Amino acid sequence: MIALVNFTYLIAMLGFVIGLKFLSSPSRAKNGNHIAAGGMALAVLATLVGLFYGVEISVVKISLIFIAIIAGYLVGKRMSDKVEMTEMPQLISFFNAMGGGCAMLLGIIESRLDDAPSTSNLSLMWAGLIIGAASFSGSIVAYRKLSGKQKDKKAAWIMWLSRILLLVFIAAPLLYVYDLIPQELELITILLSILGLVYGIIFVLPIGGADMPVVISLLNSLTGVATALAGILYDSSIMIAGGIFVGAAGVLLTLLMCQAMNRSLLAVIGGKFKASKGPVGEEEEIEIKTTSFGEVATKLAFANKVAIIPGYGLAVAQAQHLCKQLQSLLESKETEVHYIIHPVAGRMPGHMNVLLAEADVHYDILKEMDAVNDEMSSYDLAIIIGANDVVNPAAETDE
């Protein structure tokens, strides 16, 4: 039976890999999502079968497990069916918070079951607990920010408190192992989980709305890391593989988005922008050119090739349907229209693609920034919608 369960895990992992591969292609993304979800369902089923045959477990406990699975499915499906496309970032943040919360609870439960863990198990347990707690509370703050219920908060005490908490997270396991603090494992575990929750809150609080795509990606990767650590603790190959997939993909995506913004990850986390590298003390007066609806309409009427560059402002204003109307009008006059997408456009990774897809904009006319940078001179007109930050020439040098 163990061999069958492990073989089923292998099939589930293969489903994860194929699903991730398909997600990189717009035409196969939907199938990729279904394949990955099928792999997860298969992994859950294999775990239940292994649990039923591997240990003596009461019918009541099995029933509770099935009730929890069904309840989670029904709640998740209702939330997904009810949410609007424009609210998808909030939903992703909420679901990610649930993953982090699960990792935190696993650490607390493990401290109750094993009151004398080995040093390695203790390190894994507390690392997963702290990362999961920070991911949970940080994702909740991100959810509130995306919903417009939480404003940015920048203060010197936040930076100092975060540094102190990091020192506590490093020192606590060492002090416990060398008997320099009371050997109350369960109590210390709960205290660390509370401090992890506090760290997650102050981690996200200073970060501005335009940087939320990076934050969401980073929080997703943290949840993946917490899951992988829990998998090592419980000797679960499927948890390890799933956590590594999520963690690695999240880290790579985070770094790519930071590179596209010409900012370091530390600058994003700190909510800081460096000052412009222009000459100090010199001022240049530039006359701002304004335009009118009539002038823009005239330029559009005579343009043969138009670029629409959407950004964070379009996502906030939910103007994707108006863009689609403009696109249809231009295409009726045989004007070629392309949407040029910056890696961090929108409110989460890939959010701009989702918004435009909701407005029935075909993927074929979506172009990535790097693919068209050298061809911008071929466009007769570029319409920038809430994306001044990504087209500003100073973005090439300022951080």
What would you call each of these model-derived segments?
Residues F245-A303:
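Membrane-interfacial segments at transmembrane helix termini in multi-pass membrane proteins
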Residues K30-M40, I65-F66, T86-G99, D152-L165, ...:
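Cytoplasmic-side transmembrane-helix entry/capping segments in multi-pass membrane proteins
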Residues V55-E56, I109-P117, V177-L187, G209, ...:
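Transmembrane helix-loop junctions at the membrane interface of multipass transporters and ion channels
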